Amino acid sequence: MPITDVSMVSQDALSLKNVMDDVLDKTIEVFEENNVPLPSRRFWTVGSPAIDCEQLVVSFVQIYLGPPGDQAGLPQRCTMPRSAVLTISISREIPVVGVNGRAPAGDKIQEGSEAAVVDAWMFMRLLNKLDQWEPGEFGLGVIATADVSGFEGGFQTTSMQVTLAVP
């Protein structure tokens, strides 16, 4: 099945795609600035990604008319900004029950958890960059929460859901 070519569409039509590219780039930048290693698999997508290896994923969840926080609660004028809801997630391998049925040692569980809390803190550091449209020029603010999911297939995922204006 051919992939649709978007190389010739208008810049306006690429607004959300450009935000997705920018969020992925800024996420990598913040982690690199703080010497926090990231998985080599890095991409953005729509919806929930499959978790089959260590990866950094930016996922498109929703877009709506209005600034961050005014999600479809009140009627909005067509001239209002648009806001996107994205999930940024990092899945990392964690210690699991061995083939012998024994749980990992407590220190190994804690060691596996350290990356998750570092990732959550880096997500909070990332917010400053996500609210900048141009260097030194701030946007309309962001709304964000970070959490950690239960393990799935030997991987644990730290995620941040963020709502930000689409410039």
Give each language-model segment a name.
Residues 50, 69, 104, 139-144:
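Polar low-complexity intrinsically disordered regions enriched in Ser/Thr and small residues
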Residues 31-36, 54, 109-165:
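Acidic-leaning, charged glycine-interspersed low-complexity segments
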Residues 60-65, 90-92, 145, 164-166:
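Surface-exposed beta-strand edges and flanking loops
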Residues 41, 46, 98-101, 105, ...:
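A generic structural signal for ordered alpha-helices
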